[in-house]
Amino acid sequence: MFTARIARSMASESAPAASSVAPGSSGAPMADCVLEVRGVGKSFPGVVALDGVQFRVRRGTVHALMGENGAGKSTLMKIIAGVYTPDQGEILINGEPVVLNGPLDALDRGIAMIHQELNLMPYMTVAENIWIRREPKNRFGLIDHAELRRRTAALFERLSIDIDPETDVRTLTVASRQMVEIAKAVSFDSDVLIMDEPTSALTDKEVTHLFRIIRQLREQGKGIVYITHKMNELFEIADEFSVFRDGKYIGTHASSDVTRDDIIRMMVGREITQMFPKEEVPIGDVVLSVKDLCVDGVFRDVSFELRAGEILGVAGLVGSGRSNVAEALFGVVPATSGEIRIDGKPVRISTPAQAMKHGMAFLTEDRKDSGCFLNLDLLANMEAAVLSRRYVKFNFVQQAQLKRDCEEMSRMLRVKSPGLHEEIQNLSGGNQQKVLIGRWLLTQPRILILDEPTRGIDVGAKAEIHRLVSALAGKGVAVLMISSEMPEVLGMSDRVMVMHEGRMTGIVDRKDADQVRIMDLASR
């Protein structure tokens, strides 16, 4: 079976023996702690999310929170932000025990959180989103829109944010929405600011801007909790960090006292010797050929070939048109001109259904908005792409076989969940991503398009997904992989296609590809 062959290929790279770093302590004086968590536990049906953890944040510091997906980071932050109620333990603010009765209570007590999944109202303006429920009123009790604009403009000037306060949020890019979320959190003048993967959709320039804001807040004495999977960010912005693993507190250290390998060992409980396990496999015949592909006003004249067993990386800055090309290939946004050939034969792809009939699969970059059915369980999410194909005979769904294959896929991908009937919204981001990958692998694709396959995923899960992608290529699947992470592009690709402002600026062979050359092509 397809999944069994892939599983054997992945298993051939066995994990090395576990090692650990002794947990440390920041040694923060009690009077210096703006926020402290003691012995907090939280369980969900079939899952212990937090097991008696501790955590401290000092004034005027950036405290990074590290751990694999499912380690308990987001659960702890939701408890601190008043979204969840802990089953046990206590929370102290400025040394005083408190009970948080919801997110508004947490805000009133000086705790603001920027969620990884943005929570803005799309049909309201930027200013209205920032000051919602706090709008200035005129003498008639109506919203004072002039004062609303003035407050927003003053806030943006302080944070050096160049966004029109009158713009509807729905018209903004994901990166701009992220900056609005950050400004909204800052507007509460909270003592504690929690940032959950704040750079996931930002360009390098925008990340630099965000770090300037964070340093400014740190100088004002704010305590900042910074959740990230990116090691370079930890060393650049964090004063200290804590690691969680499988719902347990592992330790706290000063960022200057450890190496990248130390942190990885703390996070995963083992060594990860090969982050980019690219197999050398025979490259087969051309499966997908694209010539002069265009979507008016978005990108133009994109041409390339993709062969069986090949991983073609796609690099470029945010806004370069990478994701738009993927959407055109899969029929999400039909191309306005150009030619697509599969196995040398011209094909017309104007809908995802047509793309799937030609053996294509597409993992989108935004798993929340266009990937997951959040209110449905794992089984429903995993089977969504195959119900009309392999498992329907004589107009009846072969439920037993489908469930067996979904269970096998879940085991192969090491999805951490109580079972197939758990709602996918209760899973960590990394496990949600694995479910979506499993959805498309069940279709047995010949051409697999991956758009940011490891965004927001911890280092251990990244290595697993890299092994999976390499194993798929080894079985002859043609892979088109879009990524904003340069090490991932360079480490996994046989060739790298580079885009800039809607144009393809070059294709570089693996042996000739390096960061300088790719960035040069990406900025032409």
Swiss-Prot record:
Major localisation: membrane
Location of the ABC transporter domain: 35-271, 281-520
Compartment list: Cell inner membrane
Binding positions for ATP per the UniProt entry: G67, E68, N69, G70, A71, G72, K73, S74
E.C. designation(s): 7.5.2.11, 7.5.2.7
S-S pairs: none
Topology of this chain in the membrane: Peripheral membrane protein
Annotated catalysed reactions: D-ribose(out) + ATP + H2O = D-ribose(in) + ADP + phosphate + H(+); D-galactose(out) + ATP + H2O = D-galactose(in) + ADP + phosphate + H(+)
Keywords, in A-Z order: ATP-binding, Cell inner membrane, Cell membrane, Membrane, Nucleotide-binding, Repeat, Sugar transport, Translocase, Transport
Superkingdom in the source lineage: Bacteria
InterPro entries per the UniProt record, alphabetical: AAA+_ATPase, ABC_carbohydrate_import_ATPase, ABC_transporter-like_ATP-bd, ABC_transporter-like_CS, P-loop_NTPase
Pfam annotation, one family: ABC_tran
PANTHER family linked: CARBOHYDRATE TRANSPORT ATP-BINDING PROTEIN MG119-RELATED, GALACTOSE_METHYL GALACTOSIDE IMPORT ATP-BINDING PROTEIN MGLA
Protein function: Part of an ABC transporter complex involved in carbohydrate import. Could be involved in ribose, galactose and/or methyl galactoside import. Responsible for energy coupling to the transport system.
Protein family (similarity comment): Belongs to the ABC transporter superfamily. Carbohydrate importer 2 (CUT2) (TC 3.A.1.2) family.
Name of the protein in its database record: Putative ribose/galactose/methyl galactoside import ATP-binding protein 1
Organism: Burkholderia cenocepacia (strain HI2424)
